[in-house]
């Protein structure tokens, strides 16, 4: 009996213990540094960007130069400043989106896993259904119906991303609940809330953190795609996706569209590096299965 | 496992049925790999499906569809290449107008043949006009005020209007009024009866076949392209120069790249800046001109009571820097001096246009008694991004005067109903001519189409309305021109309408092509285009 | 059963979505003057059944659906079924090509990464695969178009064929197959040239995904005793990898491949818009922005059915590759 308890706890502790190892990987460090720099940029954009991102200068379509590090766009706005300010839109929104999706998905998945029965059935059928409809179609329909705008785009993406999280959380809760040491705890008469906080939560928390890192990257991608299609950010907002969309109209001035794209790549890559390293430290399978779509 | 397989088979067969049924309906493209004659490619960043527009009586008066309707269908009158001021004969060899400009009699040519060889007569004209009226779809307004459309004999067609309408010869040039082969269409579900809106079933037929007498016929159509073939039996003196014309739906950004590698190709959707970037390319001819479409702003009294305050509107009027708007609107762009575009009868000159005067704007704002006004600037996000640029400029202009404008650009599906439902505040919108005549611009007057969208209702400005009525009914062009100029001068002083610019428009073609000339009515005369 | 549930769900959702919009599709879709003409608006609403109460509209829609009738698109004014039949082959050709590319590349790279675990090769492949998963497809498509078409002229531009090349006789709607069937080799070459760039752009994300998952699945198998046994027996490394490791690792890889069809659909919306590819990605984007309800529901239903089908095939393949499941 005691052997079982040790075994189960072992897996968790090994995982946590592996994290410092993950930090030693160069790519993890790159990811961490990149992500941290973008967070700093998002916080400090008003002070570090050389110009007002909306200010229209007389010099249109200027190639990158000392005066304008990344050139100017079709209205004479400084692309560098706009890219920096873009972080202030994408990062907080992606975080808001991920926390909303985790609150909804985590609660529903947790309930489904813990209670089982018809609750489980309803939640999982709902999740299946959202899974079957492609993300962007659903998001486009929602945004088209509610009207474009970043907030509506966030709602739309939350609507399509909770099921992935619900599945993982449900799976983790189930596995933990079925494990011997929770059963033992019950036999020994420990109350339900104790089982939840002491046994279930710690086992669920790790993978969920990994998933969150990966989801932030995905959220940024999807939000920028909606903005690119004209369904997210609205001009003149300096949002990366809509900046790329403007750039597409002006191929000759390649810098208008290329740099916002580089910004998206770098921040999503940062979160993916982080998430990937953390995932190696935890049980990869559960996350893999849930994140397929 | 057993259950799974059964379910799978069930689903597979379901999908199979669905697709099988669907495939039965779809036209299979024909294969003739060896192009007998030359092919012309025209690219347009088209807003929607070509397939919707293949019935001229429904899909006509669509700027993007007009070039191929014009190539497939012949209308009663037409214009000489490059002209839009004097209607000349086409299917009608001549016409006469009564002195009161209410009755128009068209003599129909006897030698016009449809593409299937049938001879065209006045019955076909009567059918076409009645069908357009009774389908009551988009182009129906072309026949507003018409009380009678009759073939009095095989080669005479008479139109009667309830009010004097000297614009009728201009209206009948419209590609939506291209003459349809009535026998052929009736045999395939076409109807011109009064209940045609419900009984006409020719839409699908027109999706596969064209029924006109023009220099080209439609060979195939789908969402991405329309293929036109030369009409082998074309009755006119000038045979089409190309065996095939392909009208493709291509994004502007892609057009910019593709044209640099092409031959026999024309790009219609390049912005002024994009076109300007091609000027150095010796293989291309870039033609930039002033579009007859006007971009205007309006202050909606229905949503913003301050718009009823003429001083407030004037603060906006004199606060806008028109030249800064022209600067972002591409090569060929010009300020719109009034609502009537500079190309048409009755237009104001550039010297008469409103000029920016920040001091005057500020004093007008003070006179209005409104402190620190904030207004929402509503507009449609356009594919070229022009409206975004204009709105950003206007916002900056008005900030100089002390008016805060919050930009609210929306995609067309949201913005258009708001605009049409008079829900804009400070609106930014466009007007493309329905026909090249100042009568089309009556829409901007109180109680009319655009007027109502600005909450500017009948009785709001009696002097303007009276002048408008006289200008609309005047029969001779000299009088009309003068009255329309007076009308617009008044509009520029007292109306909530703020004409802004006529954008620059560019047509880029490979330089082996000739006669790539823009028309405000059908955009491009495909049949006239040739090669050196 | 799942299908019926899905159809009901998708249609209810689309109905609710498009009807919380305060705007009238008649006013949005009619021309400038016609939209202010009460008769034209009334005729439009009658034609599309918009004059009936919402529940009635829904029942009518379901009734038609039973006969395989998806209604008429408000945008194209054709049967949605006709529209889909026209656009699906284009998307199928693009999606299948990109999936094949992504599988071949992703699984190969994943196996290599696992065998070279934590060495330089593994790190490089990690950057490549995560890079593929981190690059916005719309941006990648534009950059690829700029570089490979505009600057280098290695590939032709947008569309499925050059303008002057006529499509092959309709058989499957997939131009590569149809042209070969008709013996039109020049058309085949042209269609492959047009296909290659959008398919690669579309494959980038899934390639990364498959590399990551193959790597972890293979790593897990490599730790097993029978792999060590096989190696100890002196079997060639390739035989070990393909006969033992890859087979044992395939269930999780298959799962991911099945789920990844969702990514492909998202990608096609963006890629088709940029490459003027006349498929359902472009169609659905235009339908959604025009609030064309019948078209939106039609596309959603179709894609959902494909998704379910693909994942059922994956379930069946499970049985083929995994002896334990076959026994059960």
Set out the residue ranges of the language-model regions:
Chain B
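Surface-exposed binding/hinge segments that line
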Residues: 141-194
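Extracytoplasmic/peripheral linker and loop segments enriched in polar/acidic and small residues
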Residues: 314, 326, 400, 406-415, ...
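Structural transition elements
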Residues: 334-367, 383-389
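N-terminal lobe/hinge region of extracytoplasmic solute-binding protein
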Residues: 43-99, 130, 211-212
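Gly/Pro-rich hinge or "lid" segments in bacterial periplasmic/extracellular proteins
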Residues: 63, 176-237
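Long beta-strand-rich cores associated with HINT superfamily self-processing modules
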Residues: 507-532
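Periplasmic-binding protein-like
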Residues: 303-344, 386-390, 491-496
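Ligand-site clamp/hinge motif
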Residues: 224, 232-278, 302, 404
